[in-house]
């Protein structure tokens, strides 16, 4: 087939193979630019990017990775000219986005990268406007709040953003911690599962307002019940009983005066109307029970639950 094509185009097989190699070359340019950034070969990376842009000025992967190279060089050397070049290239990459095959890169990720470059250039107003324009679902509240808090005359403006970011960050932390606990349990690493749950409990304790009952108490009861279940499964009945008593006491306190108000969370200073909810059970006691029993709870386990004294 190659010989037939060569005859058709009146060229040698070597020339045709060379064309195929050039077509593959643009795909390897991006990987080479990444490697040069990882090894901090800045001059070589910039030179490679300039050469690649002349050959492939409208290839997404080349334009995008060249932008990242100029961004890295500008950040390392505090060179605003390089940062401006990175900004221009990212803008061009946005227009070439239909060529992109990397699911980790999107219109949003490009815009956020541009906002980061504006921050590096100390163009705070433009960076702030870019972040606010792309803050779907409050995804960027933490970045916006952090930026505003760094501007002396705008610090109070940051509070609402920081408050919502605190709640979202806490939610993420709990999910990640519980996810790791499940992984450790499946591996048979009970100690690590217990430790990460205890770490979450320590974080929650630091966010409780003294004298107030709130959703963090319900979540804490669930986490303590999870620790009880781990102790029970590992055969440490005394520790399981102790943790279960703690979980029941906390759950009973919450159920006596349930509150979902975010205002019960320490450091939160956002809107009074914001509420937070846990995902298990209508009551804290029910949620603790579900957590302790799991999906394969036995009658013996239920008897153990019932045998732990419920607070009067």
Language model features with spans:
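Alpha-helical segment of the N-proximal tetratricopeptide repeat
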Residues: 26-61, 65, 69-79, 113, ...
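Hydrophobic micro-packing sites on short alpha-helices
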Residues: 1-17
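Flexible helix-coil transition and linker loops at the boundaries of alpha-helical arrays
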Residues: 18, 49-61, 92-107, 128-133, ...
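Short coil/turn linking the two alpha-helices of tandem helical-hairpin repeats
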Residues: 67, 72-78, 101, 149-153, ...
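Eukaryotic alpha-helical solenoid repeat scaffolds
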Residues: 190-312
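Residue register of alpha-helical TPR repeats
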Residues: 61, 109, 139, 175, ...
